[in-house]
Amino acid sequence: MCRDEPDTMILTQIEAKEACDWLRVTGFPQYAQLYEDLLFPVDIALVKREHDFLDRDAIEALCRRLNTLNKCAVMKLEISPHRKRSEDSDEDEPCAISGKWTFQRDSKRWSRLEEFDVFFPKQDPIPGSPDNSRLQSATSHESMLTDLSEHQEVASVRSLSSTSSSVPTHAAHSGDATTPRTNSVISVCSSGHFVGNDDSFSSLPSPKELSSFSFSMKGHHEKNTKSKTRSLLKRMESLKLKGSHHSKHKAPSKLGLIISAPILQEGMDEAKLKQLNCVEISALNGNHINVPMVRKRSVSNSTQTSSSSSQSETSSAVSTPSPVTRTRSLSTCNKRVGMYLEGFDPFSQSTLNNVTEQNYKNRESYPEDTVFYIPEDHKPGTFPKALSHGSFCPSGNSSVNWRTGSFHGPGHLSLRRENSHDSPKELKRRNSSSSLSSRLSIYDNVPGSILYSSSGELADLENEDIFPELDDILYHVKGMQRIVNQWSEKFSDEGDSDSALDSVSPCPSSPKQIHLDVDHDRRTPSDLDSTGNSLNEPEEPTDIPERRDSGVGASLTRCNRHRLRWHSFQSSHRPSLNSVSLQINCQSVAQMNLLQKYSLLKLTALLEKYTPSNKHGFSWAVPKFMKRIKVPDYKDRSVFGVPLTVNVQRSGQPLPQSIQQAMRYLRNHCLDQVGLFRKSGVKSRIQALRQMNESAEDNVNYEGQSAYDVADMLKQYFRDLPEPLMTNKLSETFLQIYQYVPKDQRLQAIKAAIMLLPDENREVLQTLLYFLSDVTAAVKENQMTPTNLAVCLAPSLFHLNTLKRENSSPRVMQRKQSLGKPDQKDLNENLAATQGLAHMIAECKKLFQVPEEMSRCRNSYTEQELKPLTLEALGHLNSDQPADYRHFLQDCVDGLFKEVKEKFKGWVSYPTSEQADLSYKKVSEGPPLRLWRSTIEVPAAPEEILKRLLKEQHLWDVDLLDSKVIEILDSQTEIYQYVQNSMAPHPARDYVVLRTWRTNLPRGACALLLTSVDHDRAPVAGVRVNVLLSRYLIEPCGSGKSKLTYMCRADLRGHMPEWYSKSFGHLCAAEVVKIRDSFSNQNTESKDTRSR
């Protein structure tokens, strides 16, 4: 290129750079890689077919970027390759929205994955592609795909690279360059550059940062020489690896896929084959039913997967087998080559007959005539204290529908109680002249039901007509939900005390079931009933000292600190059974990462479509770490002016305890105050409340305070945050949504914008919106509608009067404020903020759910859930030994001592405000989670610390709600379940772990190891956490003290990778500090007792 390049050429290169960055952060990193590998232009029609699950706006946004890159490819423009990040930098888990691409971790490259569909004919080779025969026989040593899919991968890449038979226009035109270009097509993932982005969407560059872009302007000959040299090195490496793995790779047959007979495994005797009902395939040739020709293809394509590459020593931080890696590899294998179901034929008549016969047996063995009677004093929403069962004996041609609780029949009906010695009572009635049969419905939740007498026995309905009473029954049923809600809310408010779950019994030595209740709206077990009280509180008072709420002071890790228990708020906003899995706080870290990328794609498509061309720039996506800004020190502050992230690092919750107590006080006692949040409080009293929050280290008592003072103090808290609740980067985006996006599109736009918020901001927003929705529910008393609340709170939440623009100087802002007259832009923003907050209050239940479009997304979103494995699955992780979970535990112990022997080599120190050492280590396998390690010195012997960890968790875990041993496996291994509280109204966190401990270790050390496990006897008591790795190592260090080392890698659900990098390590450090303080306070109390 000549030096006097036109300005249009430079702008085009900038657009290409921004397009590649956008593709990476929105879930299309494979196209950015193809452009950097000089494999553009791509076929836009093929891209549309590949992403046909996306809507039209998202496809248009994607195609705009790809067309830009196609134009740059035609103009022979290049951009600097994506720079590989250092090992210490934060980076997202690589993921693509399309399920037809896979990321190879060994080479850190993307390769196309063409799924082989057995029900459709094989696609013909792409016409016009050069060297097609040679490409068919070529193999790629770096690909994890089977030989069957390699041909499809190469063909698809050729179709993406060019639609004609010639070499792409931006490649070298000489004959010598043909071989390197072909080699780059054969091995799609040949480069070692890592395709990733920063730990959030904010890595998009600003157009003004022209100095950070580098353009390739070298001569034609120099580019050819460099390309040939690079390709020669890759070709040599490819040939060397092909020679070592020649026996494992064969060219695919041109005659199609040939499926052999099942191969008998070693150790499979005749008895085992008989037990598995294995038969010869030849015997089934004449015993099949007639199906369409397209369905006669076998769905059991058995293909051997290529051997996985060996993991490096740094890939697993503790050198233990990873359940996540094994599960992901198996699921990926099945997705690529199909699944072989041994002994199963979906089109076999015998299989259908067996299923029908088994269903018939189940129906015959089901006791259809059994009825359970509910006592009269039964309270809705709770489990009955006593149940008695009887039977229904319809006579004649009557039938009973047990699913709906109704029965039909013209004949006589007899109802009897099995435990009753009285004669059965006959229920007779005449047939209706208008129908051949009549129907009676029985409701067990209707007070004063016509089927019960005052004594509790079934009423005699022999001479009574049923139909006139149906209107009364339906009337009671319609009003039943309202009555239950009022009764439950009243009881919850009365019994919602700070010490509702303070007394937690020590962990029992024998397994017991966790006493959990079933909520009337969500039929899943919960650790709390509808009244907000624990169902497993001890009948006798325990000797555990009472813990009091303490706000957020300077010292935040004392063992007697108590969390706010706001169970009525949690139960009133508990999601229904159908929407539980759709809640954001139930998604894994990998799902959250993918969901964030899709949200950015959706938001980009909507803003580019509806906002003016000069307003939809990514001003909120400025690259991070452009310059190091000194973080202010918040040690002198406790509540007001402290960022939400600092609150999480201090206490584990984004809102201070005193602010949560203020919201609870308003919700329980002040919802009937007219003009709540609208009428102003007294400034002197508000200032006194602020000082009380800042200075109080214990409970902040709001009893007797004016509702308007507390409400004004709450508004000032959000106003004094260092940045708006919607963040500085996204506040303008929220306002643009309600200024330009049509009303019918605003809900999905605002849901996408919420997904881009930091985790702590999103959690606080959800808590606040749910709280405000409860305020509007009492609109008849307080006259505060969503719009009225939005007018009062929008300036505080969006910081409208003090919102700093990126390009606004302090002088301009000061002059703007001195004028005292808002311009039209400010008026529009205030109106948009008011409309937006009112809309979010009204639709708060829909804002924090996974979009429905994700269910249509053809990727591994459901596979990214990464549920814990069962004991049997853990035993199969080590293929070198027989299946036994004990081998897995022993590997974990060996890996722990390997780290100790190597003196924790490779760990990176991390600063923390806690009095403990904190460090982390990156793990390449599994989800994008770091392994954190925290070390502290504890004034106790190793045996005492181990006992406290095993049996006395309630003494140091302030969030503990309940704990039980589910099953004892041996003297040192058990299945343990415990539930931890979360900030209301977010659900509790449920842990089910396999834990084992060792006491006979060298030098008197002890160890405790935990890993999440799936157990059928552990009821779901909240959001099920996946603990990938948790280790406690206790080593004596003399003078009655011990060194406690805690390592943890867990997926708490509902958090982005960025949250784990910034906050989770501080929580690990705070945990060991609380364990140490539990011994320190115990020693202090014992000294005080002796002095007395």
Curated annotation (Swiss-Prot):
Residues 121-179, 297-330, 409-434, 492-553 are annotated as: Disordered. Residues 11-78 form the SAM domain. Residues 642-848 form the Rho-GAP domain. The record marks R678 as: Arginine finger. Residues 130-143, 500-512, 527-536 have a biased composition (Polar residues). It is a peripheral membrane protein. Disulfide bonds: none annotated. One of its GO terms (cellular component) is membrane. Its main location: cytoplasm. The keyword DNA-binding does not apply. Residues 415-426, 514-526 have a biased composition (Basic and acidic residues). It is found in: Cytoplasm; Cell junction, Focal adhesion; Membrane. One of its GO terms (biological process) is heart morphogenesis. Keywords: Cell junction, Cytoplasm, GTPase activation, Membrane, Phosphoprotein, Tumor suppressor. PROSITE patterns: RHOGAP, START. Pfam families: RhoGAP (PF00620), SAM_2 (PF07647), START (PF01852). GO terms for molecular function: GTPase activator activity; lipid binding. Residues 275-448 are annotated as: Focal adhesion-targeting (FAT). Residues 154-174, 299-325 have a biased composition (Low complexity). Interacts with EF1A1, facilitates EF1A1 distribution to the membrane periphery and ruffles upon growth factor stimulation and suppresses cell migration. Interacts with tensin TNS1 (via N-terminus); the interaction is decreased by phosphorylation of TNS1. Interacts with TNS3 and PTEN; in resting cells, interacts with TNS3 (via C2 tensin-type domain) but, following growth factor stimulation, TNS3 and PTEN are phosphorylated which leads to weakened interaction with TNS3 and enhanced interaction with PTEN. Functions as a GTPase-activating protein for the small GTPases RHOA, RHOB, RHOC and CDC42, terminating their downstream signaling. This induces morphological changes and detachment through cytoskeletal reorganization, playing a critical role in biological processes such as cell migration and proliferation. Also functions in vivo as an activator of the phospholipase PLCD1. Active DLC1 increases cell migration velocity but reduces directionality. The SAM domain mediates interaction with EF1A1, and functions as an autoinhibitory regulator of RhoGAP Activity. This is Rho GTPase-activating protein 7. It comes from Mus musculus (Mouse).
